[in-house]
């Protein structure tokens, strides 16, 4: 199972990489733009933050296949080993096929249906990213879509992985993992919600109180 952070905040990645068992970091144009740091500056810093074994994801901006391929090559040259995110449009599928032949790994992004995700996998995407909460927001069932996509990939494109994205709660992420997803990417707030429950801190404080009352110290 692979756990990613969905952010371009270098300081937060450095802080959380010490704590969480991270496989890497995912970004998108909106995330990069929010940080107001040029993509060619922030990507090397993110790669350094996650270390040489971490995987970094960044997205193309072009709308046509040839433009996507050229941008993917630039990203790959700038950060060797990067996985290039390609929106799963008609042109995006063409780009994924071309990049597969070039040996550049891709992630099919902006996936709103199981059929769309399956096409990306069959075209050669290493990862496929269904948007869970965004599907829910449009009146659909994001978790069911992920379940269907996971089953389809297991049957017809086992070399590709579902990397579920777009979460608002830890429950959504856990449901995707229960559906068999091999990878998820979490925004910072959801990642921290997985640990930050008041009941945990309350339990620790009770342990400390009992220990201190008995032994007059908080050390072993």
Swiss-Prot record:
PROSITE patterns attached to this UniProt entry: TRANSALDOLASE_1, TRANSALDOLASE_2
Cross-referenced SUPFAM superfamilies: Aldolase
MF terms (GO), sorted A to Z: fructose 6-phosphate aldolase activity
Keyword Lyase included in the entry's annotation: yes
UniProt xrefs under Pfam families: TAL_FSA
Locations listed in the record: Cytoplasm
EC code(s) of this entry: 4.1.2.-
Function: Catalyzes the reversible formation of fructose 6-phosphate from dihydroxyacetone and D-glyceraldehyde 3-phosphate via an aldolization reaction.
Name under which the protein is recorded: Fructose-6-phosphate aldolase
Organism: Klebsiella pneumoniae (strain 342)
């Amino acid at each position: 199972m692979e756990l990613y952070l969905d952010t371009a905040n270098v300081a937060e990645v450095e802080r959380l990489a010490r704590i969480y068992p991270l496989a890497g970091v995912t970004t998108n144009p909106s995330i990069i733009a929010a940080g107001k740091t040029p993509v060619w500056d922030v990507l090397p810093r993110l790669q350094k933050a996650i270390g040489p074994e971490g995987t970094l994801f960044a997205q193309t901006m072009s709308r046509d296949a040839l433009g996507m391929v050229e941008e993917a090559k630039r990203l790959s040259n700038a950060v060797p080993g990067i996985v290039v995110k390609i929106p799963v449009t008609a042109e995006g599928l063409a780009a994924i096929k071309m990049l597969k032949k070039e040996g550049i790994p891709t992630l099919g992004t902006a996936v709103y249906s199981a059929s769309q995700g399956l096409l990306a996998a069959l075209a050669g995407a290493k990862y496929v990213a269904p948007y869970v909460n965004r599907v829910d927001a449009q009146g659909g069932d994001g978790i069911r879509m992920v379940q269907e996509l996971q089953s389809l990939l297991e049957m017809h494109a086992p070399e590709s992985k579902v990397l579920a994205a777009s979460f608002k709660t830890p429950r959504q992420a856990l449901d995707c993992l229960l559906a068999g997803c091999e990878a998820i990417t979490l925004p910072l707030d959801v990642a921290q919600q997985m640990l930050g429950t008041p009941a945990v801190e309350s339990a620790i404080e009770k342990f400390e109180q009992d220990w201190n009352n008995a032994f007059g110290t908080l050390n072993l």
